[in-house]
Each structure stands twice: as C-alpha cells, then as structure tokens.
Amino acid sequence: MRIAVLIVLTTVLAMPASAQDTALHDPSISRDAQDGVIRLYGAGGPDTAIRKVADVWTKETGRKVEITAGPEKTWSKKAQGDADVIWGASEQAMTAFLETYKGFSSDQVEPIYLRPAVIAVKAGNPKGIMKFEDLLAEGTKIVVTEGAGVANTSGTGVWEDIAGRLGRLEDVAAFRSNIVAFEQGSGASFKAFKALDADAWITWPNWPLSNPDTLEAVPLSSDRAIWRDLSVALAPDADPDAKAFLDYLISDEAQKIMSREGWVR
C-alpha cells in the first residue's frame, strides 16, 4: 500500500506545469488571431486607461483596437481563439492566465507599468480616514478584493501584505476583524462598498480616479505601500499590428495618459 501511494505521489509531482490545465482552458478551441483587429483581453481596471491610449492610437493610425475587460469567465473562450494580447493586473494574475491561454508563455510577458494600492473611502472622506492605522479602529467597515482560490484578481493578498508589512500580528488581526466583504474582483468590491455602506476599500488608484462622485483615495505611507504591476503578453501568432500598439502603449504620449489613472513607469 505504501509503495502504491509513493508511486501515485511521484507521478503527480512529476507532471509538467503545462499539464495543469485550468477549468477555463478548452483545448478544442482553434486560434485565428490575424483578422485585422488588435484584440486585448484582461481584468477590469486597467482597461479604462488602455482604452484612452487605444483611442488616440486609432485616430493616428486608423488601426482598430478592441479591448475586452472584466471577470475572466466572461471572455475566456473568445480570448483563447483570437487574443493578440493578454494583460495581467499583477504578476500572480498573469501567471494564472498563462495556465489557461496556452498560446502565451512566461518569456513573452513584459511588465510595463506599476501602481500602488490605496485606501478608497467615500467621497468627502466623512470618517476622516487619513492612514492605515485608522482602519484598525473598532467598527470600521472594510471591503477587500480576494480571489479566494477560485477567481483571478490582482487584489488577491494585497490587504494582508499591507496589514502585515510591519511584522505585527495584531495589525493583521485587527484589520481582518473589520472586513465586511471579501469580493472576487474589483468590480464586485466596488458594488459591495456601496451596498454595504462601507468605510474603506483596499484597491487601486484608477477606481477613485474613475469614480470621483463616489470614491476618494487616501494614499498609504511608504512603510505600508504595496505595488503591483501591469504586464502584457503578445501571442506568437498575433496580428502584425499588435506589437506596434504595445510599443505605443509605453510611449511618452501614452505614459501621460496612463499616469492620469495612477500608472507609472
């Protein structure tokens, strides 16, 4: 019996990473990316700034860019067939994408921008939240974004990275006791923030900047700051113009546009 168990364990451990297909991966889908349209797919959030860059580029070149964003399950099948570019809103998110989109590989991933996590509060900051420690007060209602092992989101683990930055367990415990919702995506977190009348949400700068009537950003101090990157992966069989668009996405003009939503290089 012990020998049989050992054989099974050895077989599992020896399986290559490529064999670890995700639930979304569909090997029956055939690819046809070179259709004259540059197609980018990824999580909601970065798309608002990327769209603005794409609009300028399209006006300058006449080349069409189609951007699809949101929960991965809503676009996965289409992306497996025609994605020229996949973007990841954090490294762990991009790594997870590579398990599903087999036409892309890790050596094709390029980090292009960074942004810091922020505390989003209600517009006008009625609770007067000015720093992380204010979130530890009893009764503060906090929303966090967390994939929980079932969703691919850039917010996974960010709240505990911030809470644990100084190596104080009591900070993590106090913060966790104030969490009123763990949501599996930033869009869902924003809805929960409003529905639950929460006081704070650990998120990214683009959300308060894109929703100034509802949200206001409170920056984290440097000793609490957590940064995540925006990375892109270009498919080997991508539309020929896709690389040109990615080059433009990091141009001086594009950097000005991206910076308005908190993205820096």
Kindly give the residue locations of the regions a language model identified:
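Bacterial N-terminal signal peptides
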Residues: 4-14
